[in-house]
Regions:
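A broad detector of short, well-ordered amphipathic alpha-helices
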Residues: 8, 12-15, 39, 50-53, ...
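Proteins enriched for Cys/Gly/acidic motifs involved in redox and nucleic-acid/cofactor modification
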Residues: 19-23, 112, 126-154
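Zn2+-dependent cytidine deaminase-like catalytic core
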Residues: 31-130, 215, 241, 246-248, ...
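Short alpha-helix boundary/capping motifs
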Residues: 59, 116-117, 142-144, 309, ...
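Generic structural signal for helix capping and beta-alpha/helix-loop junctions
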Residues: 105-106, 132, 298, 320
Length: 374
């Protein structure tokens, strides 16, 4: 086995922490001595030991003189855990192979520099593309302090998310729907508009056994969410946030008594200011959001510049219907050359359905975003 093979093993280990480590990154580590794998570890949960320490602790023999493969640059600062570079030095590791550099300002090359200063041979950028992709959520959050937002929708091949009657269960098959549940476990928050609550009364939880429910975020400008809706009735069991512009204390109190949190925000173009919402959620360590909104909220999110990724689940069906709903509504763009561009698309087959996952490429920051950063 070579460096890439061992790093692939470290990547597989890192993925075991999916859904549990946020707002920390997913990290895997492998200790190799004289061609033998003697230790493996991964960051299992936020606040617990990091991958490097777990790998070293699992070693079946003395790791002195061994090589450590780790998907992300070792940390060198005190947080909830002590610096991993200290553990590496104490163990007598001879060489470290790193997948991704850590953009966290508290690390950002310092971890590698410390190792080299102590005579450890460091190889950088082993399977960098794969290691970077693993932690795209963390990289976005640690550099912007705003959640990574993935717009998710299921549609027919003619671009409909419901029939003209509003019926939408089910567009995709069971395999695709199970994939969505894994996304709900993976993302820290799930966001919809009040229109989705009124139309579907969804529960918005993760239905995987042993999975983690995302924080539910409802964009509800005027507090129209029914008190008998599933999200309100279960708010004491699953964290639920109502993002609103309604400052009426009596209205707010009814939801608060049910267990909901109220975030009262500024109004922007008749709706909740999504940029302000992202800033507040980021401050609460919500590093990622699965946006399962309808066409109105999806357009507002794109227009605000908060969407980093689109996940389109496409079923081999045709609904037709001039009035059938589409994933993105709003005003739309005026000409094709000013469309929102998508890049780095990935295609995955899920039974008879397809998932297309793409990054959103904004040609420039929206004016409202620029103003918010001044």
């Amino acid at each position: 086995m070579n460096d890439k093979d061992y790093m692939r093993l470290a990547l597989q280990l890192a993925k075991r922490g999916c859904g549990w480590t946020s707002p920390n990154p997913m990290v895997g580590a492998v200790v190799v001595k004289e061609g033998r794998t003697i230790g493996q570890g991964w960051h299992q949960r936020y606040g617990q030991a990091h991958a490097e320490r777990n790998a070293l602790a699992s070693c079946t023999e003395d790791p002195q003189g061994a090589t450590l493969y780790v998907t992300l640059e070792p940390c060198c600062h005190y947080g909830k855990q002590p610096p991993c570079v200290d553990a590496i030095l104490d163990a007598g590791i001879h060489r470290v192979a790193v997948g991704s550099a850590d953009p966290n300002p508290l690390v950002a090359g310092k971890g590698i520099a410390i190792l080299r200063a102590h005579g450890i041979d460091v190889t950088e950028n082993v399977l960098q593309e794969e290691c970077d992709a693993l932690n795209k959520v963390f990289f976005h959050y640690i550099t912007t302090k705003r959640p990574f937002v993935s717009m998710k929708y299921a549609m027919t091949m003619d671009g409909k998310i419901a029939t003209y009657t509003g019926a939408s269960k089910w567009i995709t098959g069971e395999i695709a729907r199970n994939h969505v549940q894994r996304q709900r476990h993976r993302f820290r928050g799930i966001m919809v508009g009040v229109g989705t609550i009124l139309a579907d009364d969804p529960l918005l939880t993760c239905r995987i056994e042993g999975g983690r429910d995302p924080v539910r975020i409802i964009c509800d400008t005027h507090l129209r969410t029914p008190l008998q809706s599933q999200v309100v009735m279960t708010a004491k069991q699953v964290p639920t946030i109502l993002a609103t512009c309604c400052g009426d204390p009596e209205k707010q109190a009814a939801y608060q008594q049910a267990g909901c949190r109220i975030l009262c925000l500024e109004e922007h173009c008749g709706h909740v200011n999504l940029l302000q919402l992202m800033e507040q959620l980021g401050q609460e360590q919500i590093d990622s959001i699965l946006l399962e909104g309808g066409g109105t909220l999806n357009w507002s999110a794109l227009e605000s510049g908060i969407v980093q990724q689109v996940q389109a689940y496409i079923a081999p069906k045709l609904f037709g219907g001039r009035d059938a709903k589409t994933p993105i509504e709003g005003a739309g763009v005026s000409f094709p050359d000013v469309a929102f561009q998508l890049k780095n698309s990935r295609l995955e087959r899920l039974g008879e359905d397809l998932l297309i996952e793409s990054e959103v490429e904004y040609p420039c920051l929206p004016e409202s975003w620029k103003k918010s950063e001044q």
